[in-house]
Amino acid sequence: LHPRVRRQRQMCIRDRYNAVYEAAEEDIMQDYVDGKVCAYTLVPGLQAFLQRTFPGARIRCHQSVLVKRLCDRVVDMPRVYIDIRKGWADFVVFDGTKLLMAVSHEWRAQEDIRYHLFNLLDVYDIDPKGVHVSLSGMRDEKNALMQALRGDVAYVMKTLVPGIASKTGMSLVASLLMRSEKA
């Protein structure tokens, strides 16, 4: 893209971001995955610090990593990936290879994760009996949620991750990054 067009696009994304969240222009970071943009902030001033301290370092949002690495997994039905972290669950929703949504929601109880899953299915008019749900993350929560969802969704299973991740308890994002670096 021409530098002027790129700058205009970045400003539009920053304006949209600031319509929901408050952040200084220089703190809003952007990742691009297959024509989609992920806008995010971390800590005020962090982006400038990282650019000064680690010039050329690639900084990515964990949601961007999930979208990029999971979009090519072929399933004949809509699919939802849920990565359960302490206090947060990441949801990535696809219809075929088309990304519908990538979002993180806070949770305190398993019912919160179920609520967010079924809310996403409702928003995108996806029949629970016609969806594939893949779970990863915290072992106990993942196993309990898998049992709870068995009667409600067509397919529910653990997300297949590289062997080292399952043996070491490595996060899904870290294991997907390792896999991509080896490829």
Language-model features, listed with the residues they occupy:
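A charged helix-plus-loop insertion that forms the helical arch/lid used to bind
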Residues: 10, 14-25
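Small-residue (GG/TT-enriched) beta-loop-alpha framework at ligand/catalytic clefts
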Residues: 8, 27-126
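Accessory, usually C-terminal, subdomains that scaffold auxiliary metal cofactors
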Residues: 7, 31, 39, 100, ...
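Single conserved hydrophobic/aromatic residue that forms the stacking wall/gate
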Residues: 1-13
